[in-house]
């Protein structure tokens, strides 16, 4: 979790509050970490508990609590902006996190090991605004207005707002993706809303989830592709409090016969975890190997044994990724790497990329003029941002026709760690911290 973003430089806008469900996923992760830490603590003998608290429990749980503080603040601000009564619930959750942070820190200083390490956790660890803790601050909350009357407010997954009328669309469903999306029916009044959801097509499934504040009802929408032979569009009608909103559903049936490990474009995006390659080609005894559970989402790939640079694009060991492009046009390939530095002084971190049978071109994870280990001139901000984000990006523009294409990633600089690839149609990428959820893939 701390490898995603350090707690002291996490803010309400770090993780996107709606896109790709990443704030909700982070909230779930924080609660899971807290439960794991509590479970282990309950199994330890008394003589081991002080060491466990100082070395494991406090870093994990206090860090997760700071993350939650910011995630709840983001929910509060978003709900308040659109008049959702649940904004006040999340403002209260932020207050609870602040109180819990004080309790955890006080226990570390005053009670753990009979106060042996008193003062060790007095330094600020929330909301840094500079490189140090000067002018640190708690995340801000908004005391949104709560209506006296029921009012339906609908939010569809990945959208940027709640609406009380008109139409919204869920992201596409694909026959290879097993996607499920969240549909929320919220109330401007602090009360449970009597909501009616109807859909005339039996291939659309709607299931209510038992989670969230009382003024927000959460529904999981999925598609049963066993009932479809071709791409279909449908509509969910959401009705409550004399309001109605139409929710568009598109179920895409992939009819092409595709090679194994081919990713399918969805809403103009193909997102691929690095370990899900179609081919792994070694060179001179060097090959890409998987680093399990290292990286922002799933894992990472790195060339071993280390120590060899390949200065000519395309001559190093390679990973290949197969993609189905459903709409031809201009695309951007973003390659997400760990924020590693070159193992040799004076060199930048590089890889090479080619498409299909085209020639390979060199890509740097940070432009030379913006690469400066240890900080320095403001032009080095890209490198510095990579430290905070714990990743660097390389981007390549390409024109692709409709159909199946192969992306080849070649090693150039020893030590490069590949985490994720995102191919996006021009204008279709949404703002997010982790990037899009992995696309559906043929296995």
Regions found by a protein language model. Give the residues of each.
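Generic signal for short, ordered secondary-structure residues
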Residues: 16, 48, 55, 80, ...
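General structural signal for secondary-structure boundaries
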Residues: 19, 44-48, 273
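A broadly tuned preference for mixed-charge, low-complexity surface segments
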Residues: 1-5, 84-92, 116-132, 237-245, ...
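Histidine-centered catalytic/metal-binding microenvironments
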Residues: 24-184, 235-236
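Long, charge-rich alpha-helical interaction segments
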Residues: 1-35, 39
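Histidine (H) residue identity feature
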Residues: 2, 16-19, 28-31, 125, ...
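Extracytoplasmic
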Residues: 164-167, 175-443
């Amino acid at each position: 979790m701390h490898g995603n973003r350090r707690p002291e430089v996490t803010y309400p806008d770090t993780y996107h509050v709606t896109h790709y469900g990443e704030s909700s996923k982070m909230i779930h992760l924080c609660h899971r970490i807290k439960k794991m830490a509590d479970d282990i603590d309950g199994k330890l003998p008394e003589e081991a508990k002080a060491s466990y608290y100082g070395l494991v429990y406090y870093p994990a749980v206090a860090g997760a609590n700071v993350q939650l503080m910011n995630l709840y603040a983001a929910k509060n601000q978003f709900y308040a902006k659109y008049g959702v009564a649940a904004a006040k619930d999340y403002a209260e959750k932020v207050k609870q996190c602040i109180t819990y942070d004080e309790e955890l820190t006080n226990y570390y200083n005053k009670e753990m090991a009979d106060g042996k390490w008193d003062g060790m956790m007095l330094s600020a660890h929330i909301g840094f605004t500079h490189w140090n803790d000067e002018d640190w601050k708690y995340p801000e909350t908004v005391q949104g207005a709560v209506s006296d009357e029921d009012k339906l407010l609908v939010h569809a997954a990945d959208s940027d707002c709640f609406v009380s009328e008109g139409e919204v669309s869920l992201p596409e469903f694909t026959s290879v993706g097993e996607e499920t999306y969240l549909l929320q029916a919220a109330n401007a009044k602090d009360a449970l809303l009597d909501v009616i959801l109807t859909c005339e097509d039996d291939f659309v499934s709607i299931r209510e989830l038992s989670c969230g504040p009382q003024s927000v009802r959460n529904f999981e929408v999925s598609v049963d592709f066993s009932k479809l032979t071709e791409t279909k569009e449908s509509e969910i009608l959401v009705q409550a409090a004399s309001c109605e909103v139409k929710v568009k559903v598109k179920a895409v049936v992939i009819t092409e016969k595709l090679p194994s490990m081919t990713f399918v474009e969805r809403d103009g995006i193909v997102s691929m975890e690095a370990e899900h390659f179609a081919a792994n080609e070694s060179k001179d005894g060097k090959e890409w190997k998987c680093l399990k559970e290292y990286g922002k989402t799933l894992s990472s790939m790195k060339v071993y044994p280390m120590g060899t640079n390949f200065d000519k694009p395309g001559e190093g060991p390679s990973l290949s990724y197969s993609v189905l492009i459903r709409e031809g046009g201009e695309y951007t390939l973003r390659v997400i790497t760990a924020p590693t530095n070159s193992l040799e002084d004076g060199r930048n971190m590089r890889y090479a990329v080619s498409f299909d049978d085209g020639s390979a071109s060199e890509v740097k994870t940070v432009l030379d003029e913006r690469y400066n280990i240890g900080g320095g001139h403001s032009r080095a901000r890209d490198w510095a941002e990579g430290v905070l984000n714990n990743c660097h990006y390389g981007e390549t523009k390409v024109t692709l026709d409709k159909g199946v294409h192969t992306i080849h990633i070649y090693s150039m600089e020893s030590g490069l760690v590949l985490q994720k690839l995102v191919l996006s149609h021009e204008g279709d990428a949404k703002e997010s911290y982790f990037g899009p959820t992995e696309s559906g893939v043929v296995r």
